[in-house]
């Protein structure tokens, strides 16, 4: 416990380092070589640190990795991930890249002072979708002999929980035609999942009924018996602006989860 207290209260005294463009998946494919990179931001003089893996947004069709300012100097390791994008690849390849980046983190994070039992996954919009999919559909991490339930928590910001609209578009399905198939986090609700913190913007300002999707996800997780699902609606903030206040919730929930005794 003393390390955790040090981590969050003495962060201003800590020296941080950033290493950019580490390869997390090897491939002969030029596009994979370009996109399967991550940046890691870590405190040099702390150990046993929590880690946040951050997936950028952009509708699965655009965007680039960056370390969110609100996650810096907080005593945590932050890993920002690029992944291959639609329509150059399939939705399965996007998800496979996300899983590979998480697997890399499990393998490597202790070298940077991290604790494999304190790995959280988060991201905004498309990044939130990837967060929920990899954390709930266990097959993606199983490929690396990792149990998705060993993640400390999933914290998607305004993530789609039905099948992603860009994936639907590639299959000739309209943006406003709801679809729930194997590529929808909702399809994979389960009792034994990691802690799930759902955060959206104002229901009247969000994209495509994003709040209502997440509210249904929250309800279904509760109904299947998941005991640690939370839902937050950030009033007065739309899809993009909700990210800034959402980081406060992320920090508070990480502290809560880390200070909650593990069930035997």
Model-found features: residue ranges?
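Primarily recognizes the serine-hydrolase "nucleophile elbow" in alpha/beta-hydrolase
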Residues: 106-169, 180-181
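Alpha/beta-hydrolase active-site loop
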Residues: 89-110
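The feature captures the conserved acid-bearing segment of alpha/beta-hydrolase catalytic domains
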Residues: 145-153, 158-167, 176-215, 219, ...
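Active-site glycine-rich loops that stabilize anionic/oxyanionic intermediates
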Residues: 56-61, 160
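Short amphipathic alpha-helix adjacent to the substrate-entry channel of hydrolases
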Residues: 64-81
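Short beta-strand element of the alpha/beta-hydrolase
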Residues: 48-57
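C-terminal catalytic histidine-bearing segment of alpha/beta-hydrolase fold enzymes
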Residues: 215, 222-264
């Amino acid at each position: 416990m003393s390390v955790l207290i040090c981590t969050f209260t003495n962060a201003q005294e800590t020296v941080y380092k950033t290493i950019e463009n580490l390869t997390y998946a090897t491939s002969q494919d030029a596009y994979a070589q370009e996109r399967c990179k991550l940046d890691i931001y870590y405190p040099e003089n702390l150990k046993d640190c929590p880690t946040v893996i951050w997936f950028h947004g952009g509708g699965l069709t655009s965007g680039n990795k960056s370390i969110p300012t609100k996650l810096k100097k907080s005593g945590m390791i932050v890993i920002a991930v690029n992944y291959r994008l639609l329509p150059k690849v399939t939705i399965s390849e996007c998800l496979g890249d996300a899983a590979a980046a998480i697997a890399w983190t499990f393998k490597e994070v202790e070298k940077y002072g991290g604790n494999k039992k304190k790995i959280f996954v988060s991201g905004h919009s498309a990044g939130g979708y990837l967060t929920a999919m990899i954390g709930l559909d266990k097959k993606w991490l199983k490929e690396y002999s990792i149990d998705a339930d060993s993640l400390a928590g999933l914290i998607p910001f305004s993530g789609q929980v039905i099948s992603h609209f860009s994936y639907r578009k590639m299959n000739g399905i309209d943006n406003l035609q709801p679809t729930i198939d194997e590529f929808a986090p909702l399809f994979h609700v389960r009792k034994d999942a990691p802690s799930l913190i759902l955060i959206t913007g104002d229901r009247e300002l969000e994209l495509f009924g994003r709040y209502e999707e997440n509210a249904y996800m929250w309800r279904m997780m509760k109904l299947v018996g998941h005991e640690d699902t939370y839902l937050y609606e950030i009033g007065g903030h739309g899809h993009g602006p909700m990210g800034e206040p959402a980081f406060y919730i992320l920090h508070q929930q990480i502290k809560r989860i880390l200070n909650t005794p593990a069930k035997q």
